[in-house]
Amino acid sequence: YPICWYQDKAKLLTKGQVAAVSTDTGFSLVCRLDDKEALDKIRLIRQLSEKKHFTLFCDSLSQMSKLARVNNTGYRMAKSVTPGPYTFILEATKEVPRRLSHPSKKTIGLRVPSNKALHALLEKIGEPLVGTTVIMPGEEEPLSSAWEIQDRIGDQLAFILDDGTSVIGDTTVVDLSGDEPEVIREGLGSVSALGL
């Protein structure tokens, strides 16, 4: 897509607006970090409780480190595998709205996706996006194509971004909030690449 296309899409993701974007692990519903109205809309689409945790999509480790505290070991680990299909659980900074972090642990899941289209959109927006996988209420499998998303919930979205590179699967989740890194879920990201 041309650069101007991303600028137009970035402008569309205004207050209260939700988009579906392809990531390196499937499609996610996303909105701006500080947009409670849009976040509530995502909860409504997916029928999620207030306890559901969301992931922050960042365009770089630099942006990620403004939102979370990470020690040198964790930073080196994240740097070695990002961008890529990994979600890192870290202690949130004050930059993260409290409604997004874990209520007792004050942690948040962050990732730097590797697909170019989402990366370009993140750069144009200039801030992280909050997201969750596009799984419809009562279903176990995520929606896996743009046309399927358009058919089911297209009227509730500002736009659908599909760069055709999406692979459906889970991210590998690594908790870096404690003393030692801990793999919470093994997904598309190689655990051996983490050096664990």
List each language-model region with its residue ranges:
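Active-site-adjacent structural elements in enzyme catalytic cores
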Residues: 1-196
